[in-house]
């Protein structure tokens, strides 16, 4: 049974903190538009479609999100992502989600989403 693992940076190095030691800090100074670093829904769907084309029943896929700060891609992005996974997961492979976040953007709505979709949530304490 095939297993796939993806590390996804939906907001690239974009972050809502400015930690002096972060290597993404220098990168962000070169960006003029935060939207330039966000993963498009079309790219997300292509990744998901290709992923499930490779897997058979009994397979496993892990989608781990990190950044920068992945929550800056927005809750709508994550809703789209999980809905698209359900759309393409016709063979009913096991899906696991994880996210590494600084937690600053997490609201009750985010927490409910993470719970509903069974995300493993890691909080980084930086700053």
PLM region spans:
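Short, histidine-centered active-site or binding-site loop motifs used for metal coordination
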Residues: 25-28, 65-67, 127
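Glycine-/small-residue-rich active-site loops that bind phosphorylated ligands and cofactors
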Residues: 14, 39, 70-73, 105-106
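Alpha-helix capping and helix-loop boundary segments enriched in small/acidic/polar residues
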Residues: 34-38, 69, 98
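Canonical Radical SAM [4Fe-4S] cluster-binding loop centered on the CxxxCxxC motif
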Residues: 2-42
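Short glycine-centered, acidic/aromatic-flanked micro-motifs in structured strand/loop junctions
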Residues: 10, 67-68, 101
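A generic structural signal for short coil/turn motifs at secondary-structure boundaries
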Residues: 30-33, 71-75
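Secondary-structure boundary/capping micro-motif
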Residues: 36, 44-51
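Radical SAM/AdoMet-radical enzyme domain recognition
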Residues: 48-64, 73-127
